[in-house]
Regions:
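Glycine-rich phosphate/dinucleotide-binding loop and adjoining beta-alpha-beta core of small-molecule
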Residues: 2-5, 45-137
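Positively charged, low-complexity intrinsically disordered leader regions
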Residues: 1-52
């Protein structure tokens, strides 16, 4: 059995890592994306490594969306089919999100405000993170 940190503890871990250890938030974003990519590959590409996955990444303009965009880029760069659905549900867009969005667009990832298909191998939540602060409708 292992311990899983709750929302408050995860936020404190992130804060300590960034402020006290000096690790930039954008680097944490990349590490999170790499870890999720490895998990996706181990589960879905273990039998057929050449299989192209069809992936939907749903993002909002905060840091969770930045995490999703970083993952979208890694999936795209390994040859998977990636669609990003950007739901503009918050008024403030984080700098890290803007940075990741700019990269995604420059390399050719399709970013729209709607879901263009209903048949995906992978659907990624780049909205809620470690726990929503508001009601989910």
């Amino acid at each position: 059995m292992f311990y899983v940190a709750d929302r408050t503890e995860m936020q404190e871990i992130d804060r300590l890592t960034i402020e006290e250890k000096g690790v930039p938030g954008i680097l944490l974003m990349e590490r999170a994306a790499i870890t999720v990519l490895e998990e996706i590959n181990s589960r879905l590409k273990s039998i057929n490594a050449d299989r192209k996955l069809k992936c939907l990444v749903v993002v909002e303009g905060g840091n969770n969306g930045g995490d999703g965009l970083a993952l979208a880029r890694l999936l795209y760069q390994q040859g998977d089919i990636v669609h990003v659905c950007y739901i503009n549900g918050i008024s403030r867009v984080s700098d890290s999100f803007s940075y990741q969005l700019e990269i995604a667009k420059k390399i050719g990832i399709q970013v729209t405000d709607h879901i263009i298909d209903s048949d995906y191998d992978v659907v990624v939540d780049g909205i809620f993170g470690v726990g929503p602060k508001r009601d989910v409708a």
